[in-house]
Design a protein with these regions (language model features):
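N-terminal glycine-rich anion-binding loop in soluble enzyme alpha/beta folds
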Residues: 3-62
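Short, glycine/acidic-enriched loop or turn micro-motifs at the edges of active sites
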Residues: 10, 118, 215
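Glycine-rich, highly charged phosphate/nucleotide-binding loops
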Residues: 61-70
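Glycine-rich phosphate/diphosphate-binding loops that line cofactor/substrate pockets in enzymes
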Residues: 70-80
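Active-site histidine-anchored catalytic micro-motif
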Residues: 78, 83, 91-100, 104-156
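Internal, active-site/partner-interface "lid" segment
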Residues: 134-193, 198
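Single conserved hydrophobic/aromatic residue that forms the stacking wall/gate
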Residues: 208-216
Length: 216
């Protein structure tokens, strides 16, 4: 059976990973001088506390080639084929690292690397669908063809509660952050064509919204 792997930006729960037999290549989180591997062991609340205390935002970096090789090697040694997903190539060099890892393992003909053109749940949906197809006995070529059809149809979006972290991360300027805070603006961030973009802004206390894909 084809092995499905993704980098950690798919944000799938441990329960889902185990249910669908999906392996993860962790990205790195850089917190000052400390570098951590992304995963369930990360304390999100502690990260926010650190960011607020230090008035900065943790950075992310692509996985190391060694880490990617270590995740893929057991399956290559078993003679299995692999489909590996990465966060959009517009947002990270993760896909290049995975490709180089396949080259180092002399397994380019055994590993199909898919640029999800997305992040978070947008990748997660594709990864789970690929795992279902693999469990159904689909070939690597069939799975890739199916996923290639789905990629342009999957669009992730999220509403930001505060502009502070976008400002600290260089995603918006100080004036926008100041005005946004004063007016209680909450931008909707949409991933489109592999890139993040501000689609619209909500004002006040956002309790629930469910815009149609066309609106997004």
């Amino acid at each position: 059976m084809i092995k499905i792997i993704s980098d950690s930006t798919c944000d799938l729960s441990q329960e889902v990973l185990e249910r669908y037999d999906i392996d993860i290549i962790p990205l790195h989180i850089v917190k000052g001088d400390e570098e951590l591997e992304d995963g369930p062991q990360i304390d999100i609340h502690a990260l926010y506390e650190w960011a607020d205390k230090n008035k900065t935002t943790p950075k992310t970096s692509a996985p190391s080639i060694e880490t990617a090789m270590n995740v893929m090697r057991p399956y290559i040694d078993e003679g299995r084929e692999i489909i590996c997903f990465s966060i959009s190539s517009e947002m990270s060099t993760s896909i290049n690292v995975i490709r180089m890892a396949a080259e180092e393992l002399d397994a380019v003909d055994k590993v199909t690397v898919i640029d999800s053109r997305n992040l978070s749940t947008g990748i997660g949906l594709l990864v789970v669908e690929a795992a279902v197809m693999a469990a159904d006995g689909k070939s690597r070529e069939e799975i890739k063809a199916g996923i290639d059809e789905l990629i342009p149809k999957v669009r992730a979006s999220f509403v930001v509660d505060t502009l502070v972290y976008l400002y600290r991360g260089g995603r918006c300027n100080a004036v926008s952050a100041l005005i946004g805070g004063a007016l209680a603006l909450h931008p909707m961030i949409v991933v489109k064509d592999g890139k993040m973009d501000a689609s619209r802004k909500y004002r006040g206390c956002l309790l629930y919204t469910s815009p149609s894909p066309r609106d997004a």
